[in-house]
């Protein structure tokens, strides 16, 4: 978005929002409200859309789903009127992520596809890459592997055109990781080692910490399925050594969920509980029912495997209660 037509005060507010929206919620809300108050007086759809979008983003970061939905709805109406396609696409991407986290894949898919419609009106590919990666991940969860590969390879071709900066390397790591997982889950193991070699050779040094953990989770699955148990255990040791570092693992929750299922399969009980004990307080803080259900389902599998009947029954009861809550949340999301 360009703001050259506005006075210095408004441009200052806008810059404060852009500088602080990912690190200072209070300041971001203050300047967004200043922008909205000014825009209300001047009936400026562009500024109203901008202000409400970044307030919605703050609510998303704070995991206030209800406030996010109410605010992003206001943002979308103004952004549409102003023709600000990039923020509309970003809004639909966040809506898709929230729906996906809540376990409603069809609604998430609709949001992502709506976002891609607006991406076609943009010359910058970054938002389209993000949404196509998310579509690939969603289709992997839904076991629609052909569709997943289509989205991921489209994202790969777009990412190859970007400047070779840190963002480029992060996209490439994420895309290759998801392609590898997609192939392994289909039993297509040939060539997957080459994908991981490319990640380590071309992108590893510039990758973010969480990107690396995600890749290690994928490598663990690959080495287990290919019978390379020594290499599998090396990856497990790397991940286990980082579990207690107070890192925001919620960003790779689905990777860690699949990883925990694998730990159960290969009797890595200590490492399994290290992950669970790290994730549990974060999941409670986020208060996302679908994540709580997934965590409880892992415990149920563990208790059943080890014949811990009392713990199994208690966890099963909690799972039932959470399932009922998710049904209500799904109805509310649809309505």
Please tell me what each predicted stretch does.
Residues 33-40, 73-83, 113-124, 153-164, ...:
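Amphipathic alpha-helical segments of tetratricopeptide repeats
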Residues 7-8, 46, 86, 126, ...:
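Residue signature of alpha-solenoid helical repeat architecture, marking inter-repeat boundaries
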